[in-house]
């Protein structure tokens, strides 16, 4: 049995590596499609991440919750699915052999690598730097924050955006390398719409979070590897259910430093001995000091590194012949196949190597992890059954629903005019504190949109992007709030 902790050798038809969204979705799909075949899921974490409450909002838009669950929940639902908690030691792709850290050897027929990404840490071994990646590191952050008066947050992606908004009772210095916050998701206009939310009291959440939460039992048998390196990534509402409050009584205070990165991190002693030692008195006494590339130095209790992830390919590359993309992901074709026979990949670890639709791009978001895991399972099944399969429709249009600063955010197509150069125009409608709507037009046709707030425009705009209707004659009337745009395009 593949869940056994004893060293063994086993033939398994399907092996999936990774207990995150892509891996679990892939394992569930393949286990349900081949109920009489054993499926083995290898995960470095004692908890797995499962999609729940899935809802198809429109043709391509989808909403779902993510629950962390003990692996036995999966095994109870799928009797042919066995979950083994162990990291991968090595892969010999030509021999179809996978070996785990605890000595088990699996000869697979089809393998899907869904090992996700590992955080890009500013400084790997600095005790004053915390990378927030998995559940354990989020709990460590909560613990350290409870006694903190000031933290420095480095990064401008989704986790950084959520973190600076959620933290209370602690001063936050937020260093972003771009000219505006949320550069991955927004342009400067959308960023300016959101900035007042950082300066005001938090907006009340519109709905209660009903996700089940489990904690990691540190004594769980068979746990191996560093959780900071190997644990599956946080869910989109990772901060729900944990209080992110510092030691100060004041509610909040966020100061943003734009267009800068970290140049140096000092301890008290190191700062005293540096060329900046004379500034110690004005900077105050802190456990750590951060020097930014704009020359400014801030003292803080600790530094949060939220600068993104790199594909976690390390265990698989040695001795194999994988094609690797420029972003270091495993290159996959339109059937999620890597360059090694019978090895598939999905989620953050892979890079889409096919010619993409003109209105789709890979962004390593939760939505895409689920879609890729599900589609990879279907491709593996088609391979085994020798059946044809076409690229799924979900890869036709980029679409993502999320929430930032407690505003609903919908991103569609080339929402930031990615790759369009000067060949585009923007239409923008903004109602302060209520909604922000941006449309990207190219050649008179809608190719992207950003919707912040309860706009109810997502389905109409999705249709306009997909059918590529010429909108030239509508001009700015397209965003006229006094006109029901749906009436135009029924």
From Swiss-Prot:
For the keyword Oxidoreductase, the answer is yes
- What keywords appear on the UniProt entry? Cytoplasm, FAD, Flavoprotein, NADP, Nucleus, Oxidoreductase
> What protein is this chain from?
Pyridine nucleotide-disulfide oxidoreductase domain-containing protein 1
Sample GO molecular function, one term: oxidoreductase activity
Which lineage do the record's taxonomy fields give for this organism? Eukaryota, Metazoa, Chordata, Craniata, Vertebrata
Q: Top-level EC class, please?
A: oxidoreductase
Q: What happens when the gene is disrupted?
A: Morpholino-injected embryos show severe disruption of the musculature with fragmentation of the muscle fibers, altered sarcomeric structure, loss of fiber integrity and accumulation of actin at the myosepta. Disintegration of the myofibrils with mitochondrial infiltration of the resulting space, loss of Z-disk structures, and electron dense, nemaline-like bodies are observed by electron microscopy.
- What EC number(s) would the UniProt record show? 1.8.1.-
Question: Has the keyword Protein biosynthesis been applied to this entry?
Answer: no
